[in-house]
Amino acid sequence: MSKFIVIEGLEGAGKSTAIKNVLATLAKHGITSPVTTREPGGTPLAEKMRELVKQGHPDEPLTDMAELLLLYAARAQLVGNVIKPALAKGEWVVGDRHDLSSQAYQGGGRGFDRDLMMTMRNTVLGDFKPDLTIYMDIDPKLGLQRASARGELDRIEQMKLDFFERSRERYLEFANSDESIITIDAGQDLETVTQSIITALEAWLVNNGY
C-alpha cells in the first residue's frame, strides 16, 4: 500500500540530507524509486508560483495574502496532478514540505488567523494528509546560520529571526499534538541526526508492516 511521507523544518534544518536518509531507508525495505516532490513546486505551473514566492518581483511587493494564495494554488496543482495520482497507482511519495509549512510559516510566522489557515487547508486538501511527517526541529538562529553559509538567501530566508521563532512555535504545536509527526532534534551533529532519522523511520515502517 502506498504512503505519503513528508520532511518538514525551518531553513537550515537539514531537510535535503534527511530526504536522502529516508530514500535510502525505504530502499532497504524494498521501496525503490518513490516519487519525490517539493513545495512550493513540483509541477510546471507550481514551479512558476515557487519562483514568485521565493524571489518576488523587483517592481512590486508580494503581499502576505498573495503569498498564501500562491502557496495553496501550487499545492493544489501538486496534490491533484502528481501526489494523488502516484498514490493511486501504488507508488510511495516523499515530499520536501507540505501543508505544515504553511501552517508554520504563514500561520505562525506571518500571523494569519488560525481559522483562516484551517479553512484554506480544508478547502484545498479536504481530509488528505501525509501518512508520516518527519519534522526537523532546529533553533532558528542556528538554522539561519546554516542557511547563510549555503550562499545567497531567498525572499523567505531573509525574514527576521522572530519570524522563524514564531514559525517554530507553530511547528512544535502541531508536532506535539499529532501522532503522525515525528520530531527529530536537527541541532545535533550530522551522524546523530542521521541515525535518529533512520531509527525513527525503521520503527514506523515495522509498525506498518514493511
UniProtKB/Swiss-Prot annotation:
Q: What is its EC number?
A: 2.7.4.9
Q: Catalysed reaction per UniProt?
A: dTMP + ATP = dTDP + ADP
Q: Where does ATP bind?
A: 9-16
Checking InterPro entries in the record gives:
P-loop_NTPase (IPR027417), Thymidylate_kin-like_dom (IPR039430), Thymidylate_kin_CS (IPR018095), Thymidylate_kinase (IPR018094)
Q: Which GO terms describe its cellular component?
A: cytosol
The protein's GO terms of the molecular function aspect are: ATP binding; dTMP kinase activity
Spell out the Gene3D superfamilies in the cross-references.
P-loop containing nucleotide triphosphate hydrolases
Q: Name one GO biological process term.
A: dTTP biosynthetic process
Keyword tags: ATP-binding, Kinase, Nucleotide biosynthesis, Nucleotide-binding, Transferase
Catalytic EC class: transferase
KW Transmembrane (keyword) present: no
Keyword Transmembrane helix listed? The answer is no
Q: Which domain of life is it from?
A: Bacteria
> Which HAMAP family does UniProt cross-reference here?
Thymidylate_kinase
* Family membership: Belongs to the thymidylate kinase family.
- Functional summary from the UniProt entry: Phosphorylation of dTMP to form dTDP in both de novo and salvage pathways of dTTP synthesis.
PANTHER family registered for this protein in UniProt? THYMIDYLATE KINASE, UMP-CMP KINASE 2, MITOCHONDRIAL
Q: What is this protein called?
A: Thymidylate kinase
List the source organism.
Aliivibrio fischeri (strain MJ11)
